[in-house]
Amino acid sequence: MIILVPAEQRLSLEGRIRVFELVPDPVTGDERLHRHGYSYCLDLAGGILAEYEPDELDQVTNSIGEPYAVYVSCQSMDAARTFLRDVLPGVDGLVDTNHFEILPASRFLALMGRHPEWDWRRQPSTDLQ
């Protein structure tokens, strides 16, 4: 999943994440996090934006302006939900599920609250009521 915020909010988002005591991964250059029994790999450099299709990047830019992105990978949906519940409250940005949806962070959190077992890899938000 990818968390996107306006570029001017980069330090704020990084600060939220770095408070969790990340450790460098000597192999990938990314950062690792072990929290609540889960492992995460994070790319805080923003390089994931280079992988966006032009129309996706336009969608993001039209919504939040010049973006900054954090790529987060983890081992399970429970891990993903836990991380997002810890990081997203108060974030004025977007969540890219990496499964064809980019949603406002507040809406994403609301959907997780109403549908605690939601698996966005298999079910688009438009299927939720």
Predicted regions, residues:
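Acidic (Asp/Glu-rich) sequence patches and key acidic residues
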Residues: 1-129
